[in-house]
Amino acid sequence: FYPEGFRLAEERYNHPDAGRHLNPSLLNKKRWQGESIIGKTLWVHAEQGLGDTVMCARYFPLLRKTGAKIIYECQSAAIPLLKNEFPWLELVSIESGAVANYSFDCWIGVMSLPHVFCHAADNIPGQSAYLSVSQEATNYWQHRVNELSPGRRFRVGVAWSGNPIHRADRRRSIKFEKIFPYLQKVNGVSFFVLQTNVPDECERVAINLSDELLTLDDTGALITQMDLVITVDTSIVHIAGALGKKTWLLLPYRYEWRWGLEGETNHW
């Protein structure tokens, strides 16, 4: 059902208000839909959240094979992490609003890459680690984690909530007071917070370094120091999966269709 789902997702461009959600600089350019673009310049723009940016990064090596110059406009927090793996990719911050200053032949929304490249569930690229963190971030976070959790304690990274302005946040996030008793009961484990917006009482049961997580490179480097990640459906699950870290995903009864219909593991 993945190819059909992503095909239907393309209907967003047929909505009467579709143009309102696009940068005006894109409206007079052709939207790329998979045709040959050898020798041309393709502008790719991020859509939705940081998790979607990370999820779709698995398609960047396929973009490179098109023979086009690729420019990716994405969230500034994602740039250091993407730069590690894709030094050939020109990265532009969405926050800079610089699209009007660039020359390109065609464009595509990053969430259209699965439609262009995904023809079956078993050929989704990046089903093992497809991103890496910088050595600088790795060294820093290895030192911080060893400093705060000495010895060989089992280390678990946790995230119980996502961006509160997400339209489905009420269904995906868990109130901290709901998980607090469970964290209290576990012995011999060091819990590390992987999210922001952390209540004060969290520090009674987990190590909170959220103020130091400035970019996804920081978050990813902290994740690499964990033995396990437990998270709700937010960017953390995509980062952990992209780094090849063992992850338990907490899903609501009615969950995002991309996670599939059955089984204990997932292609993403």
Describe the residue ranges of each PLM region.
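Alpha-helical solenoid repeat scaffolds of the TPR/TPR-like class and their adjacent stem/linker regions
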Residues: 1-228, 233-268
